Amino acid sequence: MRTTYMAKPGEIDRKWYVVDATDVPLGRLSTVVASILRGKNKPTFTPNVDTGDNVIVINASKVALTGKKAERKIYYHHTAYAGGLKERTAGDFLAKEPTKLIETSVKGMLPHNSLGHKMGLKLHVYAGAEHTQQAQKPEVLDITNLI
């Protein structure tokens, strides 16, 4: 009798990938990164287990915002005080905190529960070309053929 393989947390082999965000549209970058963080690129994908890999995104400040998203796309957050609704445009977000822009975009594509939080912790975003995870020997992932 054949049964469906269900991954167990101790059996997961995690890899490290480096993704260059230079001139890649934000949404397309985010979908590829979120898919890798979830583990959907592996044959051992199990929805209730974190089977994903670690992803390092470099050159976050050079990500592309297509169309007029830089002026028209607005990110909101609330300070929890009365009248504390704050808003920023995507262009302002990219200029001031490019790493947080990509983190927000990717984490919005992950499950909104404790498992999604664990997946989000495996995302490392850097504004420049240098990163601090050389010891993990990450593989360079060319996402132009994945988008």
UniProtKB/Swiss-Prot annotation:
GO terms for molecular function: mRNA binding; structural constituent of ribosome. Keywords: Ribonucleoprotein, Ribosomal protein. It comes from the Bacteria. CDD domains: Ribosomal_L13. InterPro entries: Ribosomal_uL13 (IPR005822), Ribosomal_uL13_bac-type (IPR005823), Ribosomal_uL13_CS (IPR023563), Ribosomal_uL13_sf (IPR036899). The keyword Ligase does not apply. This is Large ribosomal subunit protein uL13. It comes from Lactiplantibacillus plantarum (strain ATCC BAA-793 / NCIMB 8826 / WCFS1).
